[in-house]
């Protein structure tokens, strides 16, 4: 076995991970080498990248253009039995148990796939705080998957690589599938499985890059809250005075777009922790949606798409130009890029102080919620546990139309502990920091159109500069929300959602429908006193 390294780091032994007769290990290659490897003329199928006119390489991920939560499993053993938020028939989630025996079979499959091959190994960190970060090792035979990992995790220095020991290993066997899936009692031949005792993730059958990123997020969501540290599906940025804001929201609600703000420095766009020192990024890159991307509306993200960025599932014309408006492969077109592709970032480490503004983003497909409302501490817990939004087309396999959904903590797919644990840790951090919370609807209203990005940016500006605190307010019934009646730079006719309907009764009937869904969803949290006490903070029907 030869080890080709673009670092001074010591050679690595992959036999301890179960790999045999590996031909060559390419460890932490440079971006130049990855570019050459992923565009090689002899590559075929999903391995082959094409160079676009912007300089970024574009790849296709096949039938999996989003995560496949139905194929996610976790080994149930002494490590996980007590703390893991296991799925139940009454409250289903994505944490489905498998036995050690099934794991052993799947591990054999993946190690067979990667053994005897030339493999890429990327060693990196998940978490900008050295005290709580996970040292991650990803092993793959596909160059662009190594590129994705290099973009998305925190890149170690040569000194750190020399003594690097992984806390968690990801083995990506995208080319292999499990033919014994029925016998194993699994959902399909594809799999994304975790073993917290072995501290390993195995991937088979899916080429989608996000499985590696979100897999490690799920692990941070397990380890950190047990130490009293908030682990959050949010973006974060910092103002010139050092004030920190965090934005919660599911895919497509505007986390990346709204936190990438020329007036503020970006801490990160998707995954963060909040400890005694403040808010810190888990990642070393961004993973932005590119559907309908334009230079005018989102200049920072557009300008980040250059050499070393990696596009997924976009339509590339023969001349190398990109049709960002084409969602024929998927609405979930993406780009990953190292965070330094955004000019205005917090340096040298992606972390800030304690947050003083917490923003919940919802894309309301019903057209009921106000564009912005200020939340009481009880409403904060209620809406955090509810995690309402509309699932937008194509962000998960099998979802094609906007449908309303409730996702606990704005990230139920990535939670590995009970949702109330995250709410408890977040609200404790907010109370200690004196942070205010706001619910922002980036979705639709009675006009049938999506609220414009310009109006939403105006709302965010008013929250961040404090002018929303000076604005006169009115009460919106059913949801019992306080909304401003005017904000600088925001169309005043949209602030009360009832005003966007020709007939206000139409809003009322939709609001009652949505309120009932909130109430039905929240019932699962009312099996204890804390949950029961929050019911009054949610929508009320007479």
Swiss-Prot record:
The record's section on Pfam families has: PEPCK_ATP
- Any idea which positions bind Mn(2+)? 214, 233, 270
Q: Where does the protein end up? A: Cytoplasm
Q: How does it assemble?
A: Monomer.
What is the enzyme's main class? lyase
How is this protein named in the record?
A: Phosphoenolpyruvate carboxykinase (ATP)
PROSITE patterns per the UniProt record, alphabetical: PEPCK_ATP (PS00532)
One cellular component (GO) term of this entry: cytosol
The protein's annotated pathway: Carbohydrate biosynthesis; gluconeogenesis
Known function: Involved in the gluconeogenesis. Catalyzes the conversion of oxaloacetate (OAA) to phosphoenolpyruvate (PEP) through direct phosphoryl transfer between the nucleoside triphosphate and OAA.
Listed under catalytic activity are:
oxaloacetate + ATP = phosphoenolpyruvate + ADP + CO2
What is the native source organism of this protein? Answer: Vibrio vulnificus (strain YJ016)
Q: What is its EC number?
A: 4.1.1.49
Q: Where does substrate bind?
A: 67, 208, 214, 334
């Amino acid at each position: 076995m030869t080890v080709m390294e673009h670092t001074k780091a010591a050679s690595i032994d992959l036999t301890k991970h179960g790999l045999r007769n590996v031909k060559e290990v390419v460890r932490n290659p440079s971006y130049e080498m990855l570019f050459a490897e992923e565009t090689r003329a002899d590559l075929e199928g999903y391995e082959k990248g094409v160079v676009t006119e912007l300089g970024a390489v574009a790849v296709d991920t096949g039938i999996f253009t989003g995560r496949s939560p139905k194929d996610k499993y976790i080994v149930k053993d002494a490590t996980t039995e007590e703390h893991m938020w296991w799925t139940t028939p009454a409250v289903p989630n994505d944490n489905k148990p498998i036995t050690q025996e099934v794991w052993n079979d799947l591990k054999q499959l993946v190690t067979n796939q990667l053994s005897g091959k030339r493999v890429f190994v990327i060693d990196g960190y998940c978490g900008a705080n050295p005290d709580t970060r996970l040292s991650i090792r990803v092993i793959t035979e596909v160059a662009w998957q190594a590129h994705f990992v290099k973009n998305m995790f925190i890149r170690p220095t040569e000194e750190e690589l020399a003594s690097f020991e992984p806390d968690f290993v990801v083995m990506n066997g995208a080319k292999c599938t499990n033919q014994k899936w029925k016998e194993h009692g699994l959902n399909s031949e594809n799999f994304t499985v975790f073993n917290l005792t072995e501290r390993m993730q195995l991937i088979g059958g899916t080429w989608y890059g996000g499985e590696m990123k979100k897999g490690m997020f799920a692990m941070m969501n397990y380890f950190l809250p047990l130490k009293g540290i908030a682990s959050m599906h949010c973006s974060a940025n910092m103002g010139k005075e050092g004030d920190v804001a965090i934005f919660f929201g599911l895919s497509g609600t505007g986390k990346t777009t709204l936190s990438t703000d020329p007036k503020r420095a970006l801490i990160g766009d998707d995954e963060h922790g909040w400890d005694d020192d403040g808010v810190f990024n888990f990642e070393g890159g961004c993973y932005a949606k590119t559907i309908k991307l334009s230079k005018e509306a989102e200049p920072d993200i557009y300008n980040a798409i250059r050499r070393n960025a990696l596009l997924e599932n976009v339509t590339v014309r023969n001349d190398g130009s990109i049709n960002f408006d084409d969602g024929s492969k998927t609405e979930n077109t993406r780009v990953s890029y190292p965070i330094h592709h955004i000019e205005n970032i917090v340096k040298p480490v992606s972390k800030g102080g304690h947050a003083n503004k917490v923003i919940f983003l919802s894309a309301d497909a019903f057209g009921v919620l106000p564009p912005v409302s200020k939340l009481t501490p009880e409403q904060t817990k209620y809406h955090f546990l509810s995690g309402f939004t509309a699932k937008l087309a194509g962000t998960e396999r099998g979802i094609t139309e906007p449908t309303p959904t409730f996702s606990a903590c704005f990230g139920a797919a990535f939670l590995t502990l009970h949702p109330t644990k995250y709410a408890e840790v977040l609200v404790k951090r907010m109370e200690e920091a004196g942070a205010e919370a706001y619910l922002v609807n980036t979705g639709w209203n009675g006009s049938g159109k999506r609220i414009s990005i310009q109006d939403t940016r105006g709302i965010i500006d008013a929250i961040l500069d404090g002018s929303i605190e000076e604005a006169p307010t009115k009460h919106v019934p059913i949801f019992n929300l306080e909304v401003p009646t005017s904000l600088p730079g925001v169309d005043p006719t949209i602030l009360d959602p009832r005003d966007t309907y020709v007939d206000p009764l139409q809003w009322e009937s939709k609001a009652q429908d949505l309120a009932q869904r909130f109430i039905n969803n929240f019932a699962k949290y009312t099996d204890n006193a804390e949950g029961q006490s929050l019911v009054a903070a949610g929508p009320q029907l007479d």
